[in-house]
Amino acid sequence: MEVRGLQPKRQKTFARKHLVIVESPAKAQTIEKYLGTQYVVRASMGHVIDLPKSRLAIDIEHDFQPEYITVRGRAQCLKELRTLSKQSLQVFLASDRDREGEAIAYHLAQSIQAYCDTPIKRIVFNEITPHAIRAAIGHPVPIDTAKVNAQKARRVLDRLVGYHLCPLLWHKVKNGLSAGRVQSVALRLICEREVEVKRFVPEEYWTVEGTFEKDKKSFSALLILIQGKKAVFKSKQEATSAIGLFSQSEARVSQIRSFEKNVRPKQPFTTSTLQQCAANRLGFTSRKTMQVAQQLYEGVSLGTHRVGLITYMRTDSVRVSEAAVKEVRAWIATHFSDALPGTPNRYAAKGKSQDAHEAIRPTYVAHTPERIKAHLTRDQIRLYTLIWERFVASQMTDARVRSLTFEITAGPAVFSATETQVIEQGFYRVLKMLSPKDLSKAVLPPTKEGEVVALHNVQSVQHFTQGPVRYTDASIVKMLEEKGIGRPSTYAPTISVLLDRYYVTRIQKQLMPTPLGKVISDLLTTYFHDVVDVSFTARMESKLDEVEEDKIKWNCVIADFYPAFSEKVSTVMKDLNSMRGVFDEKTDVVCSQCGDTMVKKLGRFGFFLACGKFPECRNTQPVPLAKCPRPACDGNIVGKKTRGRKEFYGCTRFPVCDFVTHFKPTFAVCPQCRCFLVEKSNRRVGTYTACVNPECRYVSPTRKNLSLGKEAVLDGSHRGAQDKGAVQHYE
């Protein structure tokens, strides 16, 4: 019987689409705009499958097989990706094309295939642009299992080293410490450099400079020979005696030498050279450089659309695609046609370069810094400018410079003056932020050999020999790369771990080991020399590269290393005496809660004071650095941090006393007003100490400011722009 008016319920249908899985939401947002409505782009938020943090999870008895689990907090994300995969026509895995990205793609594929039979494809690209994404969709590739195995070997190796060394450090030194295959080598390098710095004894020496004039144009020259001998003097008296030998002599230009040379543009950035340049030019830490580069790579809104501005930023290759070379040459031909070489410039890859990616370059050279700066943050535009200038310059003609040297003879003395001028701009024409700083303007007057020049003034200048300098972010990255330690993706995290663990501190951009870092490094160097040996670590990196090239099996690398290492750990754990409490130091500070004396201890973030009756009394407080200089205030000055983690120094009696300074107090006392001294620095005299009291102009004498005189420090460096707002509410 038919019942009119009743219709069968219509089943809801899901419009099946293509699913693209990337690592980050920002990357997903950019790519989704390129692909249109037939694609859904989702982020895995990094690894969804990894080793558990709570246990070793390596089956040593069965070829070191890792026991993976779903990463804590990622189960819901993985569930959603599986559900979307089942509803999709096909799945594209678009994680990064390095080892970590390949492992992410592999684990996602395994998880999805266990849940549904939706076709899964791997796509790779070097830049996030519409053309690159569509080309990758049209040309999927197999998952690189050799690269996955290299990541697995690295992960297992680091887990074995960490999970054996960390308990040893906890048991013998203190809880919460860590050690790692790469970070411990970097720590050793920093500690060894610190020893070299401490051992170095500066030696005084003097040079002589003369001021000459020709046709009313003055120029300076350095005394290089006196009576046929090198003009370097051990004391001011020797320099003064030498001046007396020629001060009344006639000065003539005895020789003029001129030569020209080509200056080749530098190759495009790799991860290492980008971090070094950003540190030197912009003052960026390695971590900040990579964070900003990640933002530029994943995509930035340019008003009407979102675009990835640079290619993948973790690379050790200087290779550039032919399409990019063609594009930049067309741009140069339009804007600097006379600086376009006849053929493209080619740059040789280093021996250990993986060459999987291109060099770091802008995705569109037409996006000049001036054109897009309104859409970028200050940090983004500064880093982008470095990358853009370096890439464009790399495909321009050589610059040509002329070096002109005068030798001037005055009696038994020979002076030398040199200037370097650019005679053909070449690639210098495009450089603004990266313009060279070592090229001088014309300073030497036109003259001929044999002509007389007037010697107006002679002065002796004090110097001290320069010893080894502490590592900075730039120099430690350069050293790690030169030694073959780590890979582009590990440089910034390695430095960050050392800082976060308080093994190293960064003071005025210099990396200095803490007492804790020195103890850890000494212990590991003494008992685990192979693990923290530079050449051993470099060889291990080479073996991981061979795994990636499918030349050796990943578990063979582990098997060659683990037995001897495990035996060594057991021996040290048994024989090494405990070092717990080695940093503890009794003080005369009284506990404010129980009246017992406080003990100076070393924690994760530096020294602090703890009650001597711990655990009965758990009172802690910062270590006092100085007495508060305020009249009638009995508080102490301690280190504090703002919400933005910037350090400053204030009184313990805040808010009753609101004394604040941003300069680090020393334990020294001003001999004039009895306030404490603080550390300061400027480019002219380096680091020095000065009184915190703005009414007192005391500056402690140092080797550097002795050579310039006290006035050189006070002429605006000590009481200048740097001091404004540095000491607040003093009166």
UniProtKB/Swiss-Prot annotation:
Identify which cofactors the protein needs according to its UniProt entry.
Answer: Mg(2+)
Q: Which organism is it from?
A: Treponema pallidum (strain Nichols)
Q: Where in the chain is the site Interaction with DNA?
A: 47, 154-155, 158, 163, 170, 314, 501
What EC class is this?
A: isomerase
Q: Name one GO molecular function term.
A: zinc ion binding
Which EC numbers does the record give? Answer: 5.6.2.1
* One annotated Gene Ontology cellular component of this protein: chromosome
Q: Where is the active site?
A: 312
> Taking every annotated instance into account, which residue ranges of this chain make up the domain Toprim?
17-130
Q: What are the boundaries of the region Interaction with DNA?
A: 178-183
Keyword terms: DNA-binding, Isomerase, Magnesium, Metal-binding, Repeat, Topoisomerase, Zinc, Zinc-finger
Q: Identify the NCBIfam families for this entry.
A: topA_bact (TIGR01051)
Q: Which HAMAP family match?
A: Topoisom_1_prok (MF_00952)
Q: What is this protein called?
A: DNA topoisomerase 1
Where's the Topo IA-type catalytic domain? 144-569
GO terms for biological process? DNA topological change
Q: Enumerate the catalysed reactions.
A: ATP-independent breakage of single-stranded DNA, followed by passage and rejoining
The protein's matches in InterPro entries, at most eight in alphabetical order, are given as:
Topo_IA (IPR000380), Topo_IA_2 (IPR003601), Topo_IA_AS (IPR023406), Topo_IA_cen (IPR013497), Topo_IA_cen_sub1 (IPR013824), Topo_IA_cen_sub2 (IPR013825), Topo_IA_cen_sub3 (IPR013826), Topo_IA_core_domain (IPR023405)
Q: How does it assemble?
A: Monomer.
Give the protein's function.
Releases the supercoiling and torsional tension of DNA, which is introduced during the DNA replication and transcription, by transiently cleaving and rejoining one strand of the DNA duplex. Introduces a single-strand break via transesterification at a target site in duplex DNA. The scissile phosphodiester is attacked by the catalytic tyrosine of the enzyme, resulting in the formation of a DNA-(5'-phosphotyrosyl)-enzyme intermediate and the expulsion of a 3'-OH DNA strand. The free DNA strand then undergoes passage around the unbroken strand, thus removing DNA supercoils.
